[in-house]
Design a protein with these regions (language model features):
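Long, low-complexity, charged/polar intrinsically disordered regions in eukaryotic proteins
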Residues: 1-34
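A general alpha-helix detector
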Residues: 31-35, 51, 55
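Short capping segments at the starts of secondary-structure elements
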Residues: 36-46
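A short acidic, leucine-rich amphipathic alpha-helix
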Residues: 44-53, 78
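A short, conserved structural fragment
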Residues: 79-88
């Protein structure tokens, strides 16, 4: 049986959507929203990856495999939807208020 897909956005490519595995997307979204702070300074990409790994189901992300790619994909999608904000340089990310 083929995995169900979901359309995701990329803040860097407005108007374009991409197909992604729904189950992995939803697991990563739940983990990412659960760890990202609302306040500045937020997390770096490396901090986001480290924070979500313990929250990911091993059946979908064995040993945290591919977590980095999925963190970035979900972060870009949530940013395009206005739910995540990027702050300063070096880049840091937080939940929108």
């Amino acid at each position: 049986m083929k995995a169900e897909s979901i359309e995701i956005e990329n803040v860097l490519r407005p108007g374009k959507t991409y197909r992604a595995n729904r189950e992995k997307y939803e697991a990563m979204r739940e983990a990412l929203v659960g760890v990202l702070p609302r306040s500045v300074p937020g997390f770096s990409v490396e901090e986001m990856i480290a924070a979500v790994k313990p929250r990911l189901p091993d059946a979908l992300f064995p040993g945290g495999e591919t977590a980095g790619w999925w963190v970035k994909a979900v972060q870009l999608d949530l940013e395009a939807k206005g739910l995540v904000r990027r702050e300063g340089k070096p880049l840091r990310f937080r939940l929108a208020a």
